[in-house]
């Protein structure tokens, strides 16, 4: 019995590797029923009329790409399928490439053109100050887009002078910058805001949901998979849920097994 408590960690790693590859060998589908906070975000965007403006701030870097990039893709599929005008930006320097790739790739699927159907403003340092500047005059905050084109007069920004004119905003974040979007953005300039965050940050969102400072949130890969289900375009998040769930079950089994052996050997002593 005691030998079982001293299993070589490499054996555990092998089991985890097998759990991850099971889905590749024997593909199976998992049902991911959407939660109410995900549905709230979906319903808000789905209720917008054609040519409404949705701002998406891609405030994350490659370290959290696996959780947040699927959210970005699902949101873009939803927006472009409804012919909404997307305004993309980032307050994280390392998020620039991720944001641009997502917007260009999904936009191309729907035949969307930069400057006309969407605009990518790129990165600007300053976080809270950038949000405040956008709240007063978006053309002062971003005089040019990521590609060096003048933002003034862009068809994609028609009718938008500041954050007050945004129909909906989403902050995809791996850090605490969502608070700046709430305090200096939503509260000051009165626009609806949703958040996409890593799974570990999910519990932090509930107080803001309760105070109605957020309309909803997507938490981790599961939140992204739920949104894909609602949009009807299952992509990377839905594919990632199966191996993730198998590994989670395996870890729980290891914990239960370890506790059982521990108490069993303890009684003998």
Where are these regions (language model features)?
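N-terminal positive-inside, membrane-proximal cytosolic segments immediately preceding the first
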Residues: 1-7
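Acidic/histidine-rich, surface-exposed loop or edge segments in extracytoplasmic proteins
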Residues: 52-61
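Structural recognition of alpha->loop->beta junctions
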Residues: 101-128, 211-229
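Hydrophobic membrane-insertion alpha-helices, especially the h-region
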Residues: 10-26
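Membrane-embedded segments
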Residues: 63-119
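Membrane-proximal low-complexity regions enriched in glycine and acidic/polar residues
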Residues: 115-203
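C-terminal functional extensions of proteins
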Residues: 3, 196-269
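Alpha-helical transmembrane signal-anchor/signal-peptide segments
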Residues: 30-50
């Amino acid at each position: 019995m005691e030998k079982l408590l001293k299993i070589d960690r490499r054996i555990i790693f092998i089991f985890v590797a097998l759990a991850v590859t099971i889905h590749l060998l024997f593909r199976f589908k998992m049902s991911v029923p959407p939660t109410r906070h995900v549905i709230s975000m979906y319903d808000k965007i789905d209720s917008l009329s054609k040519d409404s403006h949705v701002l998406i701030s891609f405030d994350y870097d490659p370290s959290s790409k696996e959780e947040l990039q699927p959210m970005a893709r699902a949101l873009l599929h939803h927006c472009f399928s409804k012919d909404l005008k997307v305004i993309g930006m980032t307050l994280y320097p390392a998020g620039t490439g991720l944001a641009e790739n997502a917007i260009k790739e999904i936009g191309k699927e729907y035949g969307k053109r930069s400057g006309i159907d969407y605009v990518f403003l790129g990165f600007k340092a300053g976080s809270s100050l950038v949000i405040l500047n956008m709240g007063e005059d978006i053309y002062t905050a971003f005089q040019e887009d990521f590609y060096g084109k003048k933002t003034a007069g862009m068809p994609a920004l028609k009718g938008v002078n500041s954050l007050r004119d945004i129909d909906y905003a989403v902050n995809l974040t791996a850090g605490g910058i969502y608070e700046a979007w709430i305090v200096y953005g939503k509260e000051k300039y009165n626009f609806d805001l949703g958040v996409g965050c890593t799974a570990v940050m999910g519990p932090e969102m509930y107080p803001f949901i309760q105070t109605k400072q957020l309309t909803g949130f997507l938490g981790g890969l599961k939140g992204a998979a739920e949104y894909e289900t609602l949009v009807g375009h299952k992509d990377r998040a839905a594919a990632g849920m199966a191996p993730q769930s198998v590994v989670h079950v395996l870890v729980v089994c290891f914990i239960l097994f370890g506790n059982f052996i521990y108490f069993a050997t303890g009684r003998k002593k």
